[in-house]
Curated annotation (Swiss-Prot):
Name this protein carries in UniProt: Small ribosomal subunit protein uS15
Family: Belongs to the universal ribosomal protein uS15 family.
Assembly and binders: Part of the 30S ribosomal subunit. Forms a bridge to the 50S subunit in the 70S ribosome, contacting the 23S rRNA.
Cellular component terms (Gene Ontology): cytosolic small ribosomal subunit
UniProt lineage: Bacteria, Bacillati, Bacillota, Bacilli, Bacillales
UniProt function note: One of the primary rRNA binding proteins, it binds directly to 16S rRNA where it helps nucleate assembly of the platform of the 30S subunit by binding and bridging several RNA helices of the 16S rRNA. Forms an intersubunit bridge (bridge B4) with the 23S rRNA of the 50S subunit in the ribosome.
Length: 89
């Protein structure tokens, strides 16, 4: 269920803006999206796991805030990120 360190490093390498980047909004949003997707799969099989559901809602809210920040600060980076992640339809 949890995101492994290897998978997290792959995501960071894919979305980073420079060599030592681990905290840019793009990286944070990509890692949160991966965590949200894995937790979503978990909740499909364990429908009554309300503690995990609350964690999922907190992650979705944090990702929404980061996306709003990125949209307000740099719209081109925001558009590139949502197309890469496939967030908006």
């Amino acid at each position: 269920m949890a995101l492994t360190q290897e998978r997290k490093n792959e995501i960071i390498a894919q979305f980073r803006t420079h060599e030592t980047d681990t905290g840019s909004p793009e990286v944070q949003i990509a890692v949160l999206t991966e965590q949200i997707n894995t937790l979503n799969e978990h909740l499909r099989t364990h429908k009554k796991d309300h503690h995990s559901r609350r964690g999922l809602l907190k992650m979705v809210g944090k990702r929404r805030n980061l996306l709003t920040y990125l949209r307000n600060s740099d719209i081109t980076r925001y558009r590139e990120l949502i197309t890469k992640l496939g967030l908006r339809r």
